[in-house]
Amino acid sequence: MADNSATRVRVPSDRNSRRKIKGEVDIISSLPDVILQHILFSFQTKYAIRTSVLSKRWRHEADAINKALSQYTAPKMMNFHLKINKNNSLHHIKKWTEFAMSRNVENMSLDVRFRSNKIPRFYEINSSVKSLSHRLDLHDVIPRHGVSWTSLKKFSLSYCGLPDESAKILSGCPILEWPMQIVAPQIHCLKLRNTQLPCTLVDVSSLTEAEVLDIIIFPVNLSYNADFLHATMLEMLKKLKNVEKLTFSGSYLQNLSVAEKRGVPFPMFKVKALTLEMKHFVISDIERMLQSSPNLKKLTVRAKDNTGKYLYRYFARLESGSMLELKKGV
């Protein structure tokens, strides 16, 4: 049965009633700050500003972000998203982001679509941010002495270069969720070097050249079950199998061998130019790679220990009677 006790609201239609309401304080303006802030900051800034037609309380302050932020007095902020594509807004970045940090923001997104080394390095130490998204060049934000983001779990990078100093960020995020994911459908060359962090290639569909050097896909300090190992290795191999110019290190070949022994099928590669940078080598690992590269035309071997001459002799025998061009790297 329907509840007939619901309160009905009738909008006055006569002129006197409208005049009376016009002179009274609007109901929205009488709401507590915390409630108003929750309502306003649930919208994008441009929509929040439009709500000023409903209330006089913040109407005169809705003409600028600085004034809008001045109305936010709650001690906690869940989300802060900043998108800037004009250089004349650069001087506001520091103020706005410091404001978000002062409110213990948990999820923050910075979308800065121009290059400048003037972006302030303001957040070296932070314990509240759990999710951080950057669309800017990391050269602009990496502090000289690294960071300490003790609560950060999710870190997203878009349209930005990764300088060598980026390791300072990763080392300052003790609970960052792994594996690292690379989504870069437009890049043609990818180089993964000197990392012990698990990495997943999500979209590298335009890739024609890749270097995978001295990486440990499955770090010994992390506990992976066999199924996870199989899936991760297989997915990375699938993303690299169409690359025409490929460079592998001996450690990566060893990872391939381990994965195959655990049941991961070794894919067929379309590589035409293969470079192997070897500190130590296992003949069976190398043979397996060559067997899976039927289109191979050029092989470059760079040996970094005293066994280089023996390795070169082995490859020289393979060259005899084949179309393979063998080059001894330095």
Swiss-Prot record:
Residues 25-72 form the F-box domain. CDD domains: F-box_AtFBL13-like (cd22160). It comes from the Eukaryota. Signal peptide: none annotated. Gene3D superfamilies: Ribonuclease Inhibitor (3.80.10.10). Pfam families: F-box. This is Putative F-box protein At1g57690. It comes from Arabidopsis thaliana.
